[in-house]
Amino acid sequence: MRCPFCDTEETKVIDSRLVSDGYQVRRRRECGHCHERFTTFEMAELIIPKIIKTDGTREPFNEDKLRSGIQHALEKRPVSADDVEKAINHIILQLRATGEREVPSKLVGKLAMNELKKLDKVAYIRFASVYLSFDDIDQFTIEIEKLKD
């Protein structure tokens, strides 16, 4: 691998360890030329299904869009960035596990809601209010009552 500091190909791995529950390998590398150290992450490249939107159009899965929606729901909530990444990785893992080439956007929304329910109940309600298109306070109340059970 090329050194990001001096662009030479003389780099060696000095440490490797599993991260993200074993789905990634973190490697510390050292350049043989300039002796700078840097970190790389390696993971299997698997196909994530395309998303079928509610209007029938299809688009590639967008991890940034998922992350943005989850982070928006978690805004000002006490949830670590590491927990958010684990939730996103779990959603992606579940999408890959379907074995389908295309999945409905509703599935992504349901998976996100399930992860948010585990992370933070307030964020779950925030996300659900948009995802489920709450029209009035009664719908909030019904969803909150479901959480209490």
Curated annotation (Swiss-Prot):
InterPro entries: ATP-cone_dom, NrdR-like_N, RNR_NrdR-like. Binds 1 zinc ion. A zinc finger (unnamed) spans 3-34. Keywords: ATP-binding, DNA-binding, Metal-binding, Nucleotide-binding, Repressor, Transcription, Transcription regulation, Zinc, Zinc-finger. One of its GO terms (biological process) is negative regulation of DNA-templated transcription. One of its GO terms (molecular function) is DNA binding. Residues 49-139 form the ATP-cone domain. Its cofactor is Zn(2+). Belongs to the NrdR family. Negatively regulates transcription of bacterial ribonucleotide reductase nrd genes and operons by binding to NrdR-boxes. This is Transcriptional repressor NrdR.
